[in-house]
């Protein structure tokens, strides 16, 4: 919306700054953070009143988690509100990548909201059918992948190679849908401790904001010899809003958390990250930058698969952050150490932009 005012720069030279993606990214970050920070307390109070007992605590979880009983969930509503309002103010609303990313984020958020609603109302840690949830997620992700295919290429880039795409043809749709759904659920599995998921999400969002900006700028893309994707630069503004909203949410989610993100937030943010990775052709780099999410997801896959085969467990508890809690790490130790890992992995992922 604010981009519109840049057309009056002949009369008001100062508004020309709205043309710049870098300025609007910072502005979106500050706007979304302020919205979440200001309206957070009232949203938390409303959710606490409506939810009563709050999010159910896993009976087989660490004993220290039972003191969290009564903490409201669906905190993703705060995050999504900040992102959407800020995005509509600062993003280029004619950009198709913006709308595709918003479609996935809000659709995944709605799926997560319904899952949270069932958990709270039924007071169980099980939401609605996993198959039904995955089916809905794949449906939304496939639509997004189809749209991206229509406006771009069917390829994905390999790290360390100069502007080289592996073209998938129509297989691009199921491949991209898998990336989006897998990322959404990986972030969802990571969201198990106070502040654990939101900081790695912000780290990944900031990293992909840079990637989106570079991929969408012909000069930078040519200099770095990465694939140029016209229009993706605008995703940096949207991801800036994610970072700002995440900072605002962390104020309330820091231990001891006043609110949990819930599936409402984790699915939405993960789905958004996956969509941006697909749009910028950096799906493989997402595995590096979002490596913490990958490890969390694979720990569950390994645990479930091994248990079905042997009736034994590889980890004391999955996802893997609970394993370290069972090993004697405090919650703060797990969270901060996982934050450090996510930052290191992001730096490794970003280094691939230059190492070609």
Curated annotation (Swiss-Prot):
The cofactors it requires, by name, are: Mg(2+)
The family database entries (Pfam families) matched by this protein are listed as: Glycos_transf_4 (PF00953), MraY_sig1 (PF10555)
Give a GO biological-process term.
cell division
- Cite the entry's keywords alphabetically: Cell cycle, Cell division, Cell inner membrane, Cell membrane, Cell shape, Cell wall biogenesis/degradation, Magnesium, Membrane, Metal-binding, Peptidoglycan synthesis, Transferase, Transmembrane, Transmembrane helix
Source organism superkingdom: Bacteria
Keyword Repressor (UniProt):
no
Q: Fetch the CDD domains from UniProt.
A: GT_MraY
InterPro entries, alphabetically? Answer: Glycosyl_transferase_4 (IPR000715), PNAcMuramoyl-5peptid_Trfase (IPR003524), PNAcMuramoyl-5peptid_Trfase_CS (IPR018480)
Recorded GO cellular component terms are:
plasma membrane
Provide the E.C. number(s) assigned to this enzyme: 2.7.8.13
Q: List the catalytic activities from the record.
A: UDP-N-acetyl-alpha-D-muramoyl-L-alanyl-gamma-D-glutamyl-meso-2,6-diaminopimeloyl-D-alanyl-D-alanine + di-trans,octa-cis-undecaprenyl phosphate = di-trans,octa-cis-undecaprenyl diphospho-N-acetyl-alpha-D-muramoyl-L-alanyl-D-glutamyl-meso-2,6-diaminopimeloyl-D-alanyl-D-alanine + UMP
Give the family this protein belongs to, as stated in its UniProt record.
Answer: Belongs to the glycosyltransferase 4 family. MraY subfamily.
Under NCBIfam families, the record lists: mraY
Q: Please state what the protein is called.
A: Phospho-N-acetylmuramoyl-pentapeptide-transferase
